[in-house]
Amino acid sequence: MQSRLMPSGGPGRRWAFLRVPSTPQRRAFASTRFYFQDIFQSQLEDPSSAAVYSSLQASRAVPQTLTEKIVQKYSVGLAKDKFVKSGDYVTISPHRCMTHDNSWPVALKFMSIGATKLHDPKQIVMTLDHDVQNKSEKNLQKYRQIEDFAKHQGVEFYPAGRGIGHQVMVEEGYAWPGTLVVASDSHSNMYGGVGCLGTPIVRTDGASIWATGKTWWQIPPVAKVTLTGVLPPGVTGKDVIVALCGLFDKDDVLNHAIEFTGPEETMRSLSVDARLTIANMTTEWGALSGLFPIDNVLKGWLKGKATTAAMGLAEGPFKTLAPQHFTHPLLEQLFANPLTADKGAKYAKELFLDLSTLSPYVSGPNSVKVATPLKDLEAQNIKVNKAYLVSCTNSRASDIAAAARVFKEAAEKNGGKVPKIADGVEFYVAAASIPEQLAAEEAGDWQALLDAGATPLLPGCAQCIGLGTGLLEAGEVGISASNRNFKGRMGSTDAKAYLGSPEVVAASALTGKLSGPGWYQAPEGLTEVVRGEGDGIREEDRMLTAEQALEKLIGQIDNLVADGEKQFAPEESEESSGDSLTEVYPGFPERVSGEIVFCDADNINTDGIYPGKYTYQDDVSQETMAQVCMSNYDAQFSSIAKEGDILVTGFNFGCGSSREQAATAILAKKIPLVVSGSFGNIFSRNSINNALMGLEVPRLINRLRESFSGEGSDKSLTRRTGWTLTWDVRRSRIEVQEGENGPKWTHQVGELPPNVQEIIAKGGLEKWVKNEIGA
């Protein structure tokens, strides 16, 4: 079936969309739909407008998002003229790879596969930041092992107390705009604040990159988040991301890559520090990256870094490579042709938020999905026991300055007398890095906090990850400028943790209750935060250039094509999709078939799949792993499921922790394939890394639920369905037989390309690496 755009009623007036059969169909039809013009003939006759039209025609075949463009640069082994897109599995060779305190476990994996030398030492950065307050011999020994390994391999190493790894990556220039940088930590998203595509990996990926320079990645669906308006005084980047997490709280961007955009005035109002904060907490919003544009705001920040480095001011009593990474020639090269999303790039969804309608927000208690305007919490007089100005989210010099301003202004109102934090409150401060602390000291802000009674800590993750001194005790309430407030993360599970901006943390420490500094004044008539789907621009306010009008028209036509396929020929669409055959890697099965065993639940987490009490027992046998597989979800699973079954589950299967045994236990049960509505991202990575196959087929889950919802009192957690599923790998298609005498149907699934097949065929990523290095 071919889709053709035909002029109707004369050139430049209307367009008619015709579906023209290119092959015999079981039913013939044609549909015609009309759209009013968005561009006039006079514009097309103008040479500049005509040039725009020609360029759009030439480029629209492969328009890419900014995320896709960056991945394109760092993908290896692509076919000639291949343009990557969301959903593709690619082999990536990232610009940099950072590991922190987990460097030693990664090193053990690296050595266990027979590797002895890093593929590219310059690709790797090691930092110590998580447990820096722990002076036990066991921890110090681990730190020595990491440092010795780094020195032996020639890796850039930053010791405990130098700074949080993510901050080091940014301030040292490792996270460079337009590059792909990964780290074995979930807050790698932070690099997006400087236009760098940062995304997390797991430890096995780290070992693979160390040994081969490569790992695999599936490009996520990309969500465009348009920010409009300008933040009112007293509202910060932290309020933006806290509000986004709470206002869009239905997994709107779960496992998506985010691209932030907006009018020039809006983007100009967001400093790089604010962008880093927002990008950092896109992790809590559920995203795999949070990318800001490479624009003039970033250019100004980079120029400042380059000038400081050139003058020698970046140097100090600490190691820095900033003078090598931030140079004016590099900046000129970067901004000579900065990467941007193509016109007509496809986004999985679009959301918008009007910053001018925001007020200070606080997250919690104990959930980032609960976001409340500060004024509502202030009215509740919530007593605060501990306050934390820590973490890579909000402990830069600008954040420390904002907190210090609270005390400085209070001193001015008190005749110059320095105020103290409230009785019964403990206030902890740890800078994101030594350079940030030194900048705060030079400005007098660090001392202002100490004079008020704050307790200084080494630069490090500290209470953000529940390590070190000053953790929340049972019954206590804490307010933190960090990024995560899950129950028990910052101390006792019987404590309550809130998240807010640095000034809210400081004001709460000063008053002894959850409060702000009073800098925000609500605009008259403001009743709600303006947000929603789309780009937030009202149609009556939209002024279209010729280029924008054509882009819109092309988008309408593409959507029309998709709608037509869905509405008129779903069967043909399914079959035609299978005409493009996928190469099958030698040793990978062309077909996988088995009976469906159905676990009808969403959000089955990794503890439900493999109990936590076994996670750190290294001597658990395969038989035991098979026996306890899914036991926390259903104790009867082991007796119901059989070898060769295909496990089908609900949505977001494998959410939770990063334990690899969640995948290996299913393999121990000799189940070769898991099908779900959707997977948790880290589970997906661990599955492929350990040779467990997986497919996302929402249609199958919905069909099973329709078929078995009327089973009366039978509420089995695990059900043998009598249905069979066959996955045709070459045709990227499944066939489902609904019981012996039931209907049979097929459905197209995502392609599993040969590079991923190879990892699974080799027995997982570690064995693939062994093969690559000839170990």
Swiss-Prot record:
Superkingdom in the source lineage: Eukaryota
Q: Does the keyword Amino-acid biosynthesis apply?
A: yes
- Any idea which GO molecular function terms this record carries? 4 iron, 4 sulfur cluster binding; homoaconitate hydratase activity; metal ion binding
UniProt transit peptide range:
1-29
Keywords attached to this entry: Amino-acid biosynthesis, Iron, Iron-sulfur, Lyase, Lysine biosynthesis, Metal-binding, Mitochondrion, Transit peptide
Q: Name one GO cellular component term.
A: mitochondrial matrix
Q: What is its EC number?
A: 4.2.1.36
Tell me which SUPFAM superfamilies the record gives.
Aconitase iron-sulfur domain, LeuD/IlvD-like
Required cofactor(s): [4Fe-4S] cluster
Q: Which reactions does this protein catalyse?
A: (2R,3S)-homoisocitrate = cis-homoaconitate + H2O
Q: In which pathway does it act?
A: Amino-acid biosynthesis; L-lysine biosynthesis via AAA pathway; L-alpha-aminoadipate from 2-oxoglutarate: step 3/5
UniProt cofactor note: Binds 1 [4Fe-4S] cluster per subunit.
What role does this protein play? Catalyzes the reversible hydration of cis-homoaconitate to (2R,3S)-homoisocitrate, a step in the alpha-aminoadipate pathway for lysine biosynthesis.
- Family the UniProt entry places it in: Belongs to the aconitase/IPM isomerase family.
By what name is this protein known? Homoaconitase, mitochondrial
Gene name tied to this protein: lys4
